[in-house]
């Protein structure tokens, strides 16, 4: 069998060892399904190709995953879903168990949350209008359904290949009967992903009695069916409580791959497959083992860890095949897609270098396969489509992080070439950035954010250039890494839009968060601190030594009112700090660069308390493919990657009393927190392997070699901890 980075084939009989309560029991997949979280409650495996679960059939931003907890009806169960994105797509191959003929059957069914269940690798719900209990579980590339029908001669499974959400639209669909228990088909669509092709194969536990198919609303009787909107009804006679099971295998390459995906599940024992999925989730969750007396904290923590394993997702089938954007079939060992890099480069991707180290080479090689086809690294790739969503070229820090952490399994030279070429392309304003030293606001919207982010990405390229001895590039990328200064206005103390003539955009209101503007999903306050590679340089541009600290203080204390047509992404406010959107995520930790780590502790504890909960609306903003959750995981265990590609994690205020990190080497890194409580939130002292540790950060290397980190907490700040620049995190402008 083919090997994957998680399991060889499908381990249907994998049994978790160890003692104590299972960690999967602390995961609540409904967290984030309400409000603006945009998560889904369906069944999947870590990074699985299949995400099978319910769709409400409601159009709208808060249904970007196809499901929102506030809804009361279900239109079907589709096999692909996005986790926490701000744009809706996927929801491919919608199926619905129902009772009734095609002429009489209703489109959707009501349901009650009291009759709905979800856990890692499982989803179940009673469809009230049909008296059908629907359950589903999954392997990596195959979904397994179990439907308990009432006594009826018109029990039906409906395939609605024209089903789509938001801007997505089916362009062509296909359905063919192989025999009374086997079917194949495809759905091609366009939307956020312009060229999306999903092939599927179906195997039933019981032969159908009859099949009725509509093509573009017209009933057809033929051997195979092709049209924009294919609707197929598979009819059965059932006894009361009779369960019909169905396997649906997927491939993004061809029918052969979809049929092969069915072979991941070689049993009709639904409960066995469900247990196997839960066991696999248990194994992955156990890579971070925390100890806390607070059950709520444990539920939020392990649901957060679960969320970080929902993206990226496997794109290649069991043969290694996948389709490129032009329709060619390519082959790769393990190809991954769905990379929300503007979000995940900040903390979700760095977290994977700790918890999923063995997966990182597959991710980077997927980026390089994308580069081979497109000529540059992905920005926001969805099923290998470049959506060009958001700003920056943030595959660069992800690749740089892997190289600087000495993670092997990909070609460093090719990776550097891809990084450099992505920065030297003439699209997305890079030519303006090179020519002016900033993005002019009269040439492009979101110019301030783009300038800041390009400067950071260029710093990442600089680090790799130094490591690989590409000295011919170091001068130019050193210069470019400082271009953020070109959009800073000393008079107002804010980063501002600047036109080609060098003049600042007027009028200027730092509270205005509108679209379009010089800022991405925010205002001048929220985009005033993104210089993660050079916080010392940012401090120096203020007229007084404590100017940056005062500005940070003001961020958290000024009015939360904003002007303009504020986008809903700008949420979770403390003053103008907006935790519901990613540009704010590193800011609370910046105090440690200013030798005021106790201020970081205050804000980090406040953010964890206010903006994370174990309820459907427990996320204050979009989950964004794991980034919102990754912030919590890092913060709860006591540190955060302010500069994601630096290999440094800045201390904050650990929420849990202990965390044991299981490392790829088989060793562990233990974090023991002494005298921890709601009031004892300030770090008093730290030891690493029983030796005094005075730095306000810890390195990736120190974590991955294993050891014991002991953090002593207290109710008052220790004015002697983290107060010297030499013990602080690195900055480009700070020589050590």
Report the location of each language-model feature.
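Accessory carbohydrate-recognition regions in carbohydrate-active enzymes
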Residues: 21-349, 353-397, 403-452, 460-486, ...
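Conserved catalytic core of nucleotide polymerization and phosphodiester-bond processing enzymes
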Residues: 673
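ATP-dependent phospho-/nucleotidyl transfer catalytic cores
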Residues: 457
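Bacterial Sec-dependent N-terminal signal peptides
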Residues: 1-21
